C-alpha cells in the first residue's frame, strides 16, 4: 500500500546544536506516531530503549520499505544520508525530556533521533525524525564525542529521496559507507537558515566602522601647495594699438627721382589722311594693251572629210612590186619511202640483177636500173648518189642484224 508523501525541513542551529523537524503534511500511520525524541543524559549515558531504537529499525518498517521503495539506487542513497544524520555529539551538557516544540531547549545540543518510518502528528513539531533505515544499513557502536561533533558539523541532509516518501533528512551516530557518485536522486528544494554561530557574531563586531581619521593634519604632497595662490600673469598683458606716423617716411633709393616723369608715348598722334589716287600710274606696260581683246574666241573649228583616194600617195616605192608573188610557194617537198627488200643485196654475189619499180607514177613507166652490179659484186653509184648513201646505211643495219 502506497504511503502519502511527506516532506520535511531540517534546520540546523550551529550555535546550540539543535535540529528542527517540521512536518508539512501531517499524515502518518497510526502505529508510527509515537516516536519520542531521546536525548543523552547529563553524564553521557543513554537510555536502553533509545539505543535499541537507534541501532535497529522494526521489522515491519524494513519490510514495508523493501516493498514500497521505487528503486534500489534511491534507497541506497537515502540510507547514506540517514546514517550520517544519526551522528550526535556526546560531549554536550544537559539532557531533557521529549520536546514537542520546533526547536530543542538551550543546553541540550546533543539530541538523538529514533528511526521508525513516519513523522510526528501535526501537533508535535520536532518530536522525532521519522526515517526509514534500508535493509542494507547495519548498526554500529557509538563513537567518541569528538567524532560526533565533527559528524554534526560535517554533512547535512538537504533533500528527501523521491523513491522513499516520508523519509526526511536526519543525522545518524555512525558514518555511512561511501556511495557511488552515479546515484543521484531527485532533489527537493529545502529552505535552509544561515548558521547562527558565535563566529558570525564576532565577524559582525569586527566589521563595525572605526573612528574617522583626522583630516586636519593631512599634509599635501611635496611641492603641491607651493604655488597654491599663484595667478597666471597672462591676463595683465595689454595690447596697445598705436597709429603709425608716416610723415618722416622716405622713399627707397631713387624711387622719387622721376616722380614727375610723364611717359612720352601718349604724345604721339595718329593722323588719318585720305590717299590721293589721281596721280597713280600703272605698272610698266600695264596700260598699253588696255583695250586688247583676246582673240581666242574668234577661232573657228572646221570639220572636213579627208579624201584619201585622191590625195593620198603611197610611200616611196611601195607600188613598184605590187604584183610580186613570192617564189617560195613553188618549191616542192619530195617524200621517199625506204624499202629494205628493194635495196637489199645478197651477201654472196650470185650474178642476178636487182630491178626496182618505183611507185611514183611518171611518164616513164619503164623500169630503170638502180645500180649496176659488177662481176665483183660492187654497186655502181654514179647514177644516184643519194641512193648510195642509203644503201650503205641499209647494209650496215643488216650486218648488225646478222642477215
UniProtKB/Swiss-Prot annotation:
Residues recorded as bearing N6-methyllysine in the entry: 221
Annotated tissue distribution: Expressed in neurons.
Segments of skewed composition (Basic and acidic residues): 1-32, 90-106
Modified residues (Phosphothreonine): 58, 60, 71, 115, 131, 137-138, 143, 167, 174, 179, 193, 365, 389
Sites bearing Omega-N-methylarginine, chain numbering: 117, 311
Disulfide bonds: 253-284
Membrane topology type: Peripheral membrane protein
Modified sites of kind Phosphotyrosine: 19, 159, 356
Positions of Tau/MAP repeats: 206-236, 237-267, 268-298, 299-330
Cellular location(s): Cytoplasm, Cytosol; Cell membrane; Cytoplasm, Cytoskeleton; Cell projection, Axon
PTM sites of type N6-acetyllysine: 125, 187, 221, 243, 252, 260, 273, 279, 283, 293, 305, 309, 331, 347
Residue list for modification Phosphoserine: 35, 50, 153, 157, 160-161, 164, 176, 197, 199, 224, 247, 251, 255, 267, 286, 314, 318, 358, 362, 366, 371, 378, 384
One protein family per Pfam: Tubulin-binding
Polar residues biased stretches: 50-60, 363-378
Biased composition (Low complexity): 136-147, 156-176
Example GO biological process: microtubule cytoskeleton organization
Modified residues (N-acetylalanine): 2
Superkingdom classification of source: Eukaryota
Residues annotated with N6,N6-dimethyllysine modification: 125, 273
Post-translational modification: Polyubiquitinated. Requires functional TRAF6 and may provoke SQSTM1-dependent degradation by the proteasome.
Region (Disordered): 1-219, 360-379
Keywords: Acetylation, Cell membrane, Cell projection, Cytoplasm, Cytoskeleton, Disulfide bond, Isopeptide bond, Membrane, Methylation, Microtubule, Phosphoprotein, Repeat, Ubl conjugation
GO terms of molecular function: microtubule binding
Subunit text: Interacts with MARK1, MARK2, MARK3 and MARK4. Interacts with SQSTM1 when polyubiquitinated. Interacts with PSMC2 through SQSTM1. Interacts with FKBP4. Binds to CSNK1D. Interacts with SGK1. Interacts with PIN1. Interacts with LRRK2. Interacts with LRP1, leading to endocytosis; this interaction is reduced in the presence of LRPAP1/RAP.
Domain notes: The tau/MAP repeat binds to tubulin. Type I isoforms contain 3 repeats while type II isoforms contain 4 repeats.
Name listed for the protein in its UniProt record: Microtubule-associated protein tau
Organism: Capra hircus (Goat)
Lineage: Eukaryota, Metazoa, Chordata, Craniata, Vertebrata
